[in-house]
From Swiss-Prot:
Name of the protein in question: Ubiquitin-fold modifier 1
Processing after translation: UFM1 precursor is cleaved by UFSP1, promoting its maturation: processing of the C-terminal Ser-Cys dipeptide is required to expose its C-terminal conserved Gly residue.
UniProt entry tagged with the keyword Ribonucleoprotein: no
GO terms for biological process, alphabetical: protein K69-linked ufmylation; protein ufmylation; response to endoplasmic reticulum stress; reticulophagy
Cellular-component GO terms for this entry: cytoplasm; nucleus
Compartments (UniProt record): Nucleus; Cytoplasm
UniProt-listed PANTHER family: UBIQUITIN-FOLD MODIFIER 1
Gene name of the encoded protein: ufm1
Signal peptide residue numbers: none
Pfam families membership: Ufm1 (PF03671)
Lineage, top ranks: Eukaryota, Metazoa, Chordata, Craniata, Vertebrata
Protein family membership: Belongs to the UFM1 family.
Keyword terms: Cytoplasm, Isopeptide bond, Nucleus, Ubl conjugation, Ubl conjugation pathway
Amino acid sequence: MSKVTFKITLTSDPRLPYKVLSVPESTPFTAVLKFAAEEFKVPAATSAIITNDGIGINPAQTAGNVFLKHGSELRIIPRDRVGGRGVGTDRPSSSSSKTQ
């Protein structure tokens, strides 16, 4: 059975750490996502894998299909960086006014 190799970078860390994973091409990509999340110590259930161009990858396919469609260099991002609840809450709302 052939293997595919992915270089997965954690984009939420300013140091941009990465892991290189080699898996059988028939591996469900959900397993790749889960393993990568565990390696980076981020929650798998609320993480996403995207391409370097920012395109989200549907994990309901095999690792071989992902490799053929998107290549070997991918990024993992925790949901708090992907538009989950709480995004933008650190910014003042437009209704608050500042006096100068």
